Amino acid sequence: MKSRFDTWMMLLAIAAAGTAQAQTRAAGNPLDSLPQINAPKKGPTVTVQVAPQAPQLQELLSRHVTPTTFQVEGVKSVPFDEISRRFTPLVGKDITIGELIETANGVTKLYQDRGYALSFAFIPAQTFENGVVRVTVVEGYVADVKVTGKPGAMESKIRAIAAHITADRPLRRATFERYVNTFGLLPGLTVKANVPPPQTTDGATTLELAVDRKAFNISTGIDFNHPGVQGLITATENGLTSFGEQLSISALVPPGRDKQTYVAFSGAVPVGSSGLVTRLDASTYRGKPTDNPGLPSTVERTVKNEKLGLSASYPLLLNNQRSLLGTVSGYASHNEDRYQNKITGNSIDTRSQVRVLQMQLDYTSVSAKQVQKLSVNVAKGFNILGASKSQDITIGSDTTSVDSPISLTFVRTGATFTQTNEWPFKIGTSVSLTGQYSPDSLPTSEQVSFGSTRYALGYQPGETSGDSGWGMSLEVNRGFTPGWTYMKSITPYIAYDMARVYLHTGTPSPSRLSSVAIGVRFTDSRYYSLDLNIAKPVGDAPVESASRSPRVNAAFSYQLN
């Protein structure tokens, strides 16, 4: 009889474990519920100015000439016939020098259309004796690089990147834009690039780089959403050595109601001079969620996550309007999820050691009134290098191991799209979509979660999670610029968001999140940003508010530099 009773107790415990994992709000990646650092937007880290040619003197433009011969010199990179035939119809005609210059400008446009950034044609000073007209084509290139400001130990990296520009003769716009924007991948740097037009007919000019470097920075993101106040503080070092490294350490304070501890380290080093960046990331997290739907208050839950990862990213496309960044990463993750009855001591322990390879593409398109971003990733788990999973049920002094439902060889795909637009009357809109799909039951660290700023403003951070899910948000805003020293921008907005999650082992609760919100953002465009909003849940009831009461959210970010 006792054996049968124990069997039923174990089956009941297993069922309870499945229900708990299917319904608890924190079953997803716990890092998704941490405060975010949203530093004020300071503008691009790289600005470019290519100085135009000096205009011709107006008093010369009306002078008449009848060409008998055109002598075109300096053409090397474009078929000569394409240049000379532009001037042939002018032979024997009474024209002005202004018309000659207009034709030469057409040659300049031809070079620009072919992608030669510094090349141009002009009519040099001459007597036009016997109707002979000289046309000079300057195929421009950068012969020298002048670095000013505070490059520090990063100057060697800067010059190595600039060497790609000086090596391209004549300089093509694609080369120029790619490597000037590669400066922006160096940590802590702000670069202003200026290229004066060539002053000699050989086409040589100087690339002037004004560099500002922030060697250290401390930033913080503070949330008032949990409930209580929590902040993620990050200290960063940028390029103190010639390696051009960036080292940062982050910590969560205080532990808060869920007794969370989180510490992370990140180190990145540029490799070569073409934009390749390697990165090492390590983090450890521990928390005891207090809101666990479907479980009595006597059950205590403990979540642990440790992660170590290596990645390499490379800009496949990089210019002034668009970029495409490819990233390959591999990481190992250790996860523990424990449910324990505080009265009886009975417990359910789920553990996993995950080994994952992930590939990701990040695309950005920027125009005067619109910014688009698209991120796509595919991840595959492998049962190698110590990967494992286990689930233990302890009743009294007896511990029984059962099969864990999670997959170590899972496949996970995801995508995120955002678009912001600026319309007349300073009206702005923002649309964001995200989704994740997996045909497998995922380990804790691989699940997708929603709540608060993640597509559910009316809910707590990490309110719900699942193996698959999607979210969307819409926002309409209107920016005001009072121009005050400590408040450069005020942006009121209204927003709507919704999210859905799905599990292979059950139905999460809540699973259908929706909310409407009204809020305002403040920033000085340098040091701080403050986001305040009131959000009303209109989907499933939140774990902490069955009446769907409005929720006040506040997020504050600050950086020293």
Question: PLM features: what roles do these ranges have?
Answer:
Residues 507-561:
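C-terminal beta-signal and terminal closure region of outer-membrane beta-barrel proteins
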Residues 18-22:
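Sec/Tat signal peptide C-region and signal peptidase I cleavage site
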Residues 9-17:
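Bacterial N-terminal signal peptides
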